[in-house]
A protein has these predicted regions:
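Short Pro/Gly-enriched beta-strand edge/turn motifs at strand-loop
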Residues: 406-408
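Surface-exposed, proline-enriched loop/turn segments that connect beta strands in immunoglobulin-like
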Residues: 21, 410-412
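Non-catalytic cap/lid and distal C-terminal segments of serine-dependent acyl enzymes
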Residues: 2-57, 61-395, 400-404, 417-433, ...
Length: 454
C-alpha cells in the first residue's frame, strides 16, 4: 500500500484481500487497478453509478491464474459507488470496500483530491462516535443513531449544542461516518479552532410504518425526530437545550427532510443546511416565515443544474425579503465530495451567538415494541444495517414537477420464517442460474420467482 495514502481514504467496515491482491488499488499517479478472482467466469466488468464514475462498463482482462484485472489511468478524484458484473450479473464484491447505499451493501473506493485533506485522519485529538438505540413511535421498531461527541466530552461536564445531520436516499445512519467522514471533519475543524464544539446526531431517516407505501418524504420522520430522537439525546447526553442550540442539515433526501422539518418547526431550530437540495423550492417557506433563522446554508455541485438554478431563485427571494442566506457551489455532481465540503463550510457558521436555553421539546412519545419484533431485529442485525430497509427508489414527479419518488419493497436476501425455514432470494435478471453456498460446502440451487421478474 502507498504509505503516503491517508487512512481515511480506506476506512470501510469490511475489506479483505483475495488471492493476495486487493480488489481496488489506487496508485500514486492516479491510476486505479481493479481485480477480481473468478476462475469460472468468462466476462468480468466494473461500472459506476454516474457522475465522475459513469455507468459505462469497463472490461477486466484475465490474468491466466483465475483472476481478472483492469488498470484505468487518471481516475477522477472522489468517493465512488460502483458495481461488479460477472458474466452480466451485477454483484457486490465481498472482498472490496463496502458501505451502505442504494438500500443495500455496495462497493466503494476513493481517489484523493489533490491538496484536500480536511477529512483526513490526523494526529490530533479525536472525538467519539457512539451507536445508540431508541424506539420509534412511528414504526414501533428499535432503531439506531450515530452520535459524535467532541474530544474531552467524557472527562468534562460541559454541555454542547447539537446538529442533527441526515443522509441521502438509499443510505442510512452509517453514511455520514463511513462515506462522509463527518467525525474526522469535525475533529479537524475543532482542532483548528474553526467551529464551536458540538454534538452531531446522525439517524436513519426512514420512518416507514409496516405496509406503508410512502412517497418522497419517507414516512413521518418529523415526528420520530421531535418526539423520539431529540428527547433521547437531551436525556442521555449533556446538551444545551433550546432553539438557539439546535440545528438541522442533510444531503439530497436528507436536505428535503431538513427543509421540511425546519420550515414546520422554526421555533425549535436556529439553522438549516441544505446540501444538494432536491426540494429546494420548499426553502420559500423558510423565507416567508415570520421567524428568522440564524443560518441558512445551501449548496450543490456544479453539474447539478436544476438544483443550482433553484438555489439562485431562492437566494434572490431571500435578498428581496431583506433576509440573509449563504449559497455555495462546488465542483462535482450529486456525490459525497460535494457534501463533505458542504459540511466543512456549514459547521463553522453554527452556534456563534449566545442564546437562551429553553426546554422546548414536547414530551417523549413512547411506543411498545413487541417481543417478536425485537427477536427479528436481533437476528437481522448486521455491521451496516441494524433495522434494514428493504426498499428501492423509483424517481417520479408530481403534477407540479416536484420530486415524488416512491419506495417499492424488495425481497430480503434471506428471511427466516416462524417455522425456522430459510428463504433465500437474489435479484439477478441476467443470470442463467443462481446457487447459494451453505456453510461453504452444500450448494442450493435457486429457482426463478414467477411473481417477481428478475
Amino acid at each position: 500500500m502507498n504509505e503516503k495514502r491517508n487512512g481515511a481514504l480506506d476506512r470501510y467496515p469490511i475489506e479483505k484481500k483475495r488471492a493476495g491482491r486487493p480488489s481496488v488499488t489506487v496508485k500514486e499517479d492516479g491510476a486505479v487497478i481493479f481485480y477480481l478472482y473468478a476462475p469460472a467466469a468468462k466476462i468480468v466488468q466494473v461500472a459506476g453509478l454516474g457522475g465522475y464514475f459513469t455507468n459505462k462498463k469497463i472490461d477486466l482482462m484475465p490474468d491466466g491464474q483465475g483472476g481478472f484485472f483492469a488498470e484505468v489511468q487518471d481516475f477522477h478524484w472522489g468517493m465512488h459507488y460502483y458495481f461488479w458484473y460477472v458474466d452480466g450479473v451485477r454483484i457486490c464484491n465481498p472482498y472490496a470496500g463496502i458501505s451502505y447505499g442504494c438500500f443495500a451493501a455496495i462497493n466503494t473506493f476513493e481517489v484523493q483530491e489533490k491538496n484536500v485533506d480536511f477529512y483526513f485522519a490526523k494526529d490530533i485529538p479525536h472525538g467519539t462516535v457512539s451507536i445508540c438505540k431508541y424506539v420509534s413511535e412511528v414504526s414501533s421498531h428499535l432503531k439506531e443513531c450515530y452520535v459524535y461527541t467532541p474530544y474531552g466530552y467524557e472527562e468534562g461536564d460541559e454541555r454542547y449544542p447539537v446538529l442533527y445531520l441526515q443522509h441521502g436516499v438509499g443510505e442510512n445512519e452509517t453514511g455520514w461516518i463511513w462515506q462522509g467522514k463527518a467525525n474526522l471533519i469535525m475533529d479537524c475543524l475543532i482542532a483548528e479552532g474553526k467551529c464551536e464544539k458540538m454534538i452531531v446526531v446522525m439517524s436513519s431517516g426512514y420512518a416507514f410504518k409496516d405496509g406503508e407505501k410512502p412517497v418522497f418524504y419517507p414516512g413521518n420522520f418529523e415526528s420520530e425526530l421531535i418526539h423520539n430522537i431529540i428527547p433521547y439525546i437531551e436525556k442521555n447526553f449533556r446538551v444545551r437545550k433550546g432553539r438557539d442550540y439546535r440545528a438541522m442539515a442533510g444531503l439530497s433526501l436528507g436536505s428535503a427532510q431538513a427543509t421540511d422539518i425546519v420550515a414546520k418547526n422554526m421555533k425549535l431550530f436556529s439553522a438549516a443546511g441544505v446540501f444538494s437540495g432536491v426540494a429546494i423550492h420548499e426553502m420559500e417557506r423558510i423565507c416567508d416565515s415570520d421567524e428568522q433563522l440564524d443560518v441558512v446554508f445551501m449548496s450543490c455541485g456544479t453539474y447539478e443544474e436544476q438544483i443550482r438554478e433553484g438555489m439562485e431563485q431562492i437566494e434572490q427571494k431571500f435578498e428581496n425579503a431583506g433576509k440573509y442566506c449563504i449559497s455555495k457551489v462546488y465542483e462535482g455532481y450529486h456525490e459525497w465530495h460535494v457534501w463533505r465540503k458542504s459540511l466543512y463550510d456549514f459547521v463553522p457558521l453554527l452556534f456563534r451567538k449566545a442564546g437562551a436555553e429553553t426546554d422546548d421539546i414536547p414530551g417523549e412519545r413512547t411506543a411498545r415494541i413487541t417481543r417478536q419484533r425485537l427477536q427479528r431485529q436481533t437476528m437481522e442485525e448486521q455491521i451496516l444495517m441494524f433495522d434494514p430497509v428493504y426498499r428501492q427508489i423509483r424517481f417520479e414527479t408530481d403534477e407540479a414537477g416536484r420530486p415524488a419518488g416512491k419506495y417499492p419493497d424488495i425481497p430480503h436476501g434471506i428471511c427466516i420464517t416462524e417455522q425456522g425455514t430459510a428463504v433465500v432470494c437474489f435479484e439477478a435478471p441476467e443470470a442463467v442460474s443462481v446457487e447459494a453456498a451453505l456453510d461453504g460446502k452444500e450448494f442450493l440451487k435457486l429457482r426463478k420467482d414467477q411473481e417477481r421478474q428478475g
